[in-house]
Amino acid sequence: MQERKRVLVKFSGEALAGENGFGIENSILKFIASEIKELIKNQIEVGIVIGGGNIIRGVSAAKGGLIKRTSGDHMGMLATVINAIAIQEALESSGLEVRVQSAIQMEAFCETYIMRRAQRHLEKGRVVVFAAGTGNPYFTTDTTAILRAVEIDADMVIKATKVNGVYDKDPKQFDDAVFLNTLSYDEAMQDNIKVMDDTAIALAKDNKLPIVVCNMFEEGNLLKIIQGDTSLCSIVKNN
């Protein structure tokens, strides 16, 4: 009998916008749906966390001083709900069963997050999209991804981004940037390394949860990673 695999995939909100830089690009939704469908076909249980940066970022909204940081973060949480509903529609259009669970109660749109209910959905082959972050300001959607992964007992978190992994410095600015295939949690928390915020990585470290950073636009990438091929991405784990 094949061993059950359960993963949490984190998508950035900006990635949904494509070249537009804002809003939601339908072609990207369709691509995400096709990639997730392949995982479900291979008996992999999938949870998803999506950012809201294609609509608004709490930190950016609060920069001018008019909007408080807490209110900015609340606005960001609502943005993730918009994205979660969009992903739900795309996944359902591809024939998958999907549930959106929000950390903030909004019964007209989605379920309220309950850990045990989320686990049951996953066991039944449904995709669960976790929205509204942790429900608290000052916590990123990266931290949300790690938290939900720990709660649902996921085997790994895959951070699907617009780049193929982690570098020792910004490859867009430095031609000599070195690609890092494997990092420890402590290395991932160094100032020059941009994987996730320190709160997220510390939580992953405490729970020995691997984090894989990969290019979300590489067809078949998610399935390859879960099946053990991490040659074209970066993985953060215990040494």
From Swiss-Prot:
<keyword id="KW-0808">Transferase</keyword>
<dbReference type="InterPro" id="IPR011817">
    <property type="entry name" value="Uridylate_kinase"/>
</dbReference>
<dbReference type="GO" id="GO:0006225">
    <property type="term" value="P:UDP biosynthetic process"/>
</dbReference>
<dbReference type="GO" id="GO:0005829">
    <property type="term" value="C:cytosol"/>
</dbReference>
<keyword id="KW-0067">ATP-binding</keyword>
<feature type="binding site">
    <location>
        <position position="53"/>
    </location>
    <ligand>
        <name>ATP</name>
    </ligand>
</feature>
<feature type="binding site">
    <location>
        <position position="57"/>
    </location>
    <ligand>
        <name>ATP</name>
    </ligand>
</feature>
<feature type="binding site">
    <location>
        <position position="170"/>
    </location>
    <ligand>
        <name>ATP</name>
    </ligand>
</feature>
<feature type="binding site">
    <location>
        <position position="167"/>
    </location>
    <ligand>
        <name>ATP</name>
    </ligand>
</feature>
<keyword id="KW-0418">Kinase</keyword>
<keyword id="KW-0665">Pyrimidine biosynthesis</keyword>
<dbReference type="GO" id="GO:0005524">
    <property type="term" value="F:ATP binding"/>
</dbReference>
<dbReference type="InterPro" id="IPR036393">
    <property type="entry name" value="AceGlu_kinase-like_sf"/>
</dbReference>
<dbReference type="GO" id="GO:0033862">
    <property type="term" value="F:UMP kinase activity"/>
</dbReference>
<feature type="binding site">
    <location>
        <position position="161"/>
    </location>
    <ligand>
        <name>ATP</name>
    </ligand>
</feature>
<protein>
    <recommendedName>
        <fullName>Uridylate kinase</fullName>
        <ecNumber>2.7.4.22</ecNumber>
    </recommendedName>
</protein>
<dbReference type="InterPro" id="IPR015963">
    <property type="entry name" value="Uridylate_kinase_bac"/>
</dbReference>
<keyword id="KW-0021">Allosteric enzyme</keyword>
<feature type="binding site">
    <location>
        <begin position="10"/>
        <end position="13"/>
    </location>
    <ligand>
        <name>ATP</name>
    </ligand>
</feature>
<feature type="binding site">
    <location>
        <position position="52"/>
    </location>
    <ligand>
        <name>UMP</name>
    </ligand>
</feature>
<feature type="binding site">
    <location>
        <position position="73"/>
    </location>
    <ligand>
        <name>UMP</name>
    </ligand>
</feature>
<feature type="binding site">
    <location>
        <begin position="134"/>
        <end position="141"/>
    </location>
    <ligand>
        <name>UMP</name>
    </ligand>
</feature>
<dbReference type="GO" id="GO:0044210">
    <property type="term" value="P:'de novo' CTP biosynthetic process"/>
</dbReference>
<keyword id="KW-0963">Cytoplasm</keyword>
<keyword id="KW-0547">Nucleotide-binding</keyword>
<dbReference type="InterPro" id="IPR001048">
    <property type="entry name" value="Asp/Glu/Uridylate_kinase"/>
</dbReference>
<comment type="similarity">
    <text>Belongs to the UMP kinase family.</text>
</comment>
<dbReference type="Pfam" id="PF00696">
    <property type="entry name" value="AA_kinase"/>
</dbReference>
<comment type="function">
    <text>Catalyzes the reversible phosphorylation of UMP to UDP.</text>
</comment>
<comment type="subunit">
    <text>Homohexamer.</text>
</comment>
<comment type="pathway">
    <text>Pyrimidine metabolism; CTP biosynthesis via de novo pathway; UDP from UMP (UMPK route): step 1/1.</text>
</comment>
<feature type="region of interest" description="Involved in allosteric activation by GTP">
    <location>
        <begin position="18"/>
        <end position="23"/>
    </location>
</feature>
